Amino acid sequence: MEGGGMTTIPGFNQIQFEGFCRFIDQGLTEELSKFPKIEDIDQEIEFQLFVETYQLVEPLIKERDAVYDSLTYSSELYVSARLIWKTSRDMQEQTIFIGSIPLMNSQGTSIVNGIYRIVINQILQSPGIYYRSELDHNGISVYTGTIISDWGGRSELEIDRKARIWARVSRKQKISILVLSSAMGSNLREILENVCYPEIFLSFLSDKEKKKIGSKENAILEFYQQFACVDGDPIFSESLWKELQKKFFQQRCELGRIGRRNMNRRLNLDIPQNNTFLLPRDLLAAADHLIGLKFGMGTLDDMNHLQNKRIRSVADLLQDQFGLALVRLENAVRGTICGAIRHKLIPTPQNLVTSTPLTTTYESFFGLHPLSQVLDRTNPLTQIVHGRKFSSLGPGGLTGRTASFRIRDIHPSHYGRICPIDTSEGINVGLIGSLAIHARIGHWGSLESPFYEISERSTGVRMLYLSPGRDEYYMVAAGNSLALNQDIQEDQVVPARYRQEFLTIAWEQVHLRSIFPFQYFSIGASLIPFIEHNDANRALMSSNMQRQAVPLSRSEKCIVGTGVERQAALDSGALVIAEREGRVVYTDTDKILFSGDGETLSIPLVMYKRSNKNTCMHQKPQVQRGKCIKKGQILADGAATVEGELALGKNVLVAYMPWEGYNSEDAVLISERLVYEDIYTSFHIKKYEIQTHVTSQGPEKVTNEIPHLEAHFIRNLDKNGIVKQGSWVETGDVLVGKLTPQVVKESSYAPEDRLLRAILGIQVSTSKETCLKVPIGGRGRVIDVRWIQKKGGSSYNPEMIRVYILQKREIKVGDKVAGRHGNKGIISKILPRQDMPYLQDGRSVDLVFNPLGVPSRMNLGQIFECSLGLAGSLLDRHYRIAPFDERYEQEASRKVVFSELYEASKQTANPWAFEPEYPGKSRIFDGRTGNPFEQPVLIGKPYILKLIHQVDDKIHGRSSGHYALVTQQPLRGRAKQGGQRVGEMEVWALEGFGVAHILQEMLTYKSDHIRARQEVLGTTIVGGTIPNPKDAPESFRLLVRELRSLALELNHFLVSEKNFQIHRKEA
């Protein structure tokens, strides 16, 4: 990096790797060193662990086997332990197994119970003290100092109009700072000696106050009385002091090492770093600063500045869990020692320690903790972006409903650290974000960003990583790094940042400059070409929608890209990379044999594996037999990658024009070519599973002999009752035949069964059919069947059978497609290719977008990409465009697009590609009539993605199904075969049309009128007219009963239609 100023993009999984390595190297040692010596009550036995000699054993199973058999890919932790009998001076030392720790794989994820999981980083308010000012109801500024502990607990210091200082211990209760300082161990003389304004402290010290702080015990009693809201006069005791320590001091006064560092820096203190608790000296210095603010001295804090935030990385979260597990282990060891002494047994270190606390703690953490999530594996991009997310939610953090707009907003300190674009939409906007490409987590949990230092003394370029707050003291040139590397004129002025302000200064005044055009953005935003021409809201949608793109059966590289595609594919783990030099011996669809350094390696390839979003993960060999390869070369492409580059969509011919209203309001018109030539065809793999239990009537049985089922439905079962691999199955077919034993009541026995029971005493048991069947929309090819048998075979460890079915899905009406600029739409019609508009060279258009979707959304990047893609397809070129190219010259993007179109029109003899009267547009023809359209139309080849929101997963209908027990109304949701809700506004719409009978049907027969819907079923079978309902529906009867529970009686009558007679009827 010296000299040329060149830099490489860091590995996208680096943050996860560094966090896990820090946990293994430092976190384990730190927590083990805190494990105390354990002694029994009589101090006869002493047990201790040795930190220096812990060992992590390499796992016995491979990652692939862990996924296949639903196991945890973990390493066993062994620690040396010593047990000393003090009476006989005997000593035993053993290396003991204390539990398993899930390991991180090469993609930065963990495999727990066969499921890929990832721990995302959490961003929290950093512990320390923060000063802010608010206006009270009289418009007077009120200054407060908030002390945040390492656990997230908060205490506030306030100064009132009379310059009296209070510590707020709860929402309603506050106490004098003198009382709190005295309760923490300071006397009045020490307080006055350690403050800058002793006269102010003396001014609000009354005789009553002097009595309260006369001794530490009095101060503790006063503090306890205020904190616990206790009436009367409590008496000082050790238990009272312990309760106060547990409820207040431990939760709100433990600063931690980061909090101690922040407190020392903010208040100019020199307290040692190992003193991590709040001291009276801290309180008094904080009060001094508060008095200074009252008199116009000192500065307030910006709570949303990144220097006041910290990242809880994977290392911190795993270390916390390890500490929790050791506390549980300590309690278990104490209990075992007491039990052994009581029963006069001689324990060994191995007998004292159990692996359950550590193993179960990590299993529950990965399974239940909000920051441990199932890895999203829709496509390779989704995997790497998931690991770089951060969240403000979770334990100790914010909630989506209480977070303010200021917390969610972009801050100048985010520059180069947090992406200003990539965040979730909806209630969590601004709370869940993505780290910028070059950001890294520093030693103190701060986010650091790299800059190049500009020095007059040396010609070389030095790269610095600066934490938030430090870069504010430098003039940072925000220009494009490639442009700044050129010869700079003496009088050149450049845009720069200084103390959160943007300035234009001379080049000689610049201290630092950014290193990369993508430095400010996340991976998702960095994949958008011409992002500078898009509105930020549309760029946000695009970076989210790229993560929803489905890997296609035949992937294709984008013509117009940004250059980050290769790195994204490389770090995703979708590719197979050569780890050494060598020669390819043999290639097949499922493996590559590779010889190097005198040994032959077999590299297995992923074949039709299911991701957790039901997409298909598949690897294809890219090398031929006998070819010599170098280290780092690509051996096989994965899903959605081509030649080692990310390939999420297809380059298709698009026209921006209205077409008979079929593309209004974000609808998209497509050609049947996309269906018949499998342009947007994708494979999806669904998993169906069933368990066999041991019931009270006996074990469930897997068999192919299922009574009362047509042979057609069980045609694909083998002799064991499990579907054959390779079978084609349709809706309703049995995948696994299973019978569950059940005892039937005697009254329902057949006569011959009763006779057998009476004469021979044979108990006749019948079985219920509980087969696994193909649900609606589940048709496809069975590609894999797994019978997982857990060790032990008890009823608590049931056997599990999993069936995987592959579906081939062409694009169809109702599917969602999107570009890379937030331009999304639903397929509305599939036209025959002869009816689609066609170009002057006879080619028909593939997609028709609505031009009205561009100006109001201000995502003009799609126009540049569209035209440049057309030029690239004609010239057979690929372009990689860095963002913000206008910094080279004015209108740089437009110039490069027009110059390439002009070159394409000349070189390929297609003059229509660039027409000077309307550059970028062309006259095209109506496929139905052959006549040209009145206006020239924008045509091009953008990169269009097919998203995972597919109509096959969403379309749903119900004729009959399950009803809720209380309301007797149909259930809700596609998964429960539920009904469509007719709400209040839908009723108004039907009333407006005057369709009284349809409305009555909706609210009675099709909803919750039990008798009426039974009659409908009968009349449908027999024929005839459907009778009108004679009484109130179930929901009305429910309302009457609920009112009765409130002691309100609703008198209601039913009026006859014929003679208007009133009939009283009990609801």
Curated annotation (Swiss-Prot):
It comes from Ipomoea purpurea (Common morning glory). It is found in: Plastid, Chloroplast. Coiled coil: none annotated. One of its GO terms (molecular function) is DNA binding. Pfam families: RNA_pol_Rpb2_2 (PF04561), RNA_pol_Rpb2_3 (PF04565), RNA_pol_Rpb2_6 (PF00562), RNA_pol_Rpb2_7 (PF04560). Its EC number is 2.7.7.6. InterPro entries: DNA-dir_RNA_pol_bsu_ext_1_sf (IPR042107), DNA-dir_RNA_pol_su2 (IPR015712), DNA-dir_RNAP_su2_dom (IPR007120), DNA-dir_RNAP_su2_hyb_sf (IPR037033), RNA_pol_bsu_bac (IPR010243), RNA_pol_bsu_CS (IPR007121), RNA_pol_Rpb2_2 (IPR007642), RNA_pol_Rpb2_2_sf (IPR037034). One of its GO terms (cellular component) is DNA-directed RNA polymerase complex. The keyword Acyltransferase does not apply. It is an enzyme of class 2 (transferase). DNA-dependent RNA polymerase catalyzes the transcription of DNA into RNA using the four ribonucleoside triphosphates as substrates. In plastids the minimal PEP RNA polymerase catalytic core is composed of four subunits: alpha, beta, beta', and beta''. When a (nuclear-encoded) sigma factor is associated with the core the holoenzyme is formed, which can initiate transcription. The keyword Plastid applies. This is DNA-directed RNA polymerase subunit beta. Belongs to the RNA polymerase beta chain family. It catalyses: RNA(n) + a ribonucleoside 5'-triphosphate = RNA(n+1) + diphosphate. Keywords: Chloroplast, DNA-directed RNA polymerase, Nucleotidyltransferase, Plastid, Transcription, Transferase. GO terms for biological process: DNA-templated transcription. The gene is rpoB.
